[in-house]
Amino acid sequence: MAGKAHRLNAEEREQLLPNLRAVGWNEVEGRDAIFKEFHFKDFNRAFGFMTRVALQAEKLDHHPEWFNVYNKVHITLSTHECTGLSERDINLASFIEQVAASLS
């Protein structure tokens, strides 16, 4: 299990968030979290994506909030331990991007 998470400070956010914004991640209004909606060819690809992300999330002991309808997967990331964005969210979002790219 990873060490205690800390909430990203302003400098860390300036360094880490632009790359995620560039690929479609947005900040949740009124909450210290990021989200993105992914679209796939069909339900099987969406479910395969979720399965790969779930396996990694379990390894990291850091789980996304997500919602799936057919070929769409909406993901929100925030770290409950520090009540906001942490490096764990950035790392998981980066992994999620790699998985999504491999399925397109």
From Swiss-Prot:
It comes from the Eukaryota. GO terms for cellular component: cytoplasm; nucleus. GO terms for biological process: tetrahydrobiopterin biosynthetic process. One of its GO terms (molecular function) is 4-alpha-hydroxytetrahydrobiopterin dehydratase activity. The major tissues expressing cDcoH are hypothalamus, kidney and liver. Belongs to the pterin-4-alpha-carbinolamine dehydratase family. Involved in tetrahydrobiopterin biosynthesis. Seems to both prevent the formation of 7-pterins and accelerate the formation of quinonoid-BH2. Coactivator for HNF1A-dependent transcription. Regulates the dimerization of homeodomain protein HNF1A and enhances its transcriptional activity. Also acts as a coactivator for HNF1B-dependent transcription. This is Pterin-4-alpha-carbinolamine dehydratase. The gene is PCBD1.
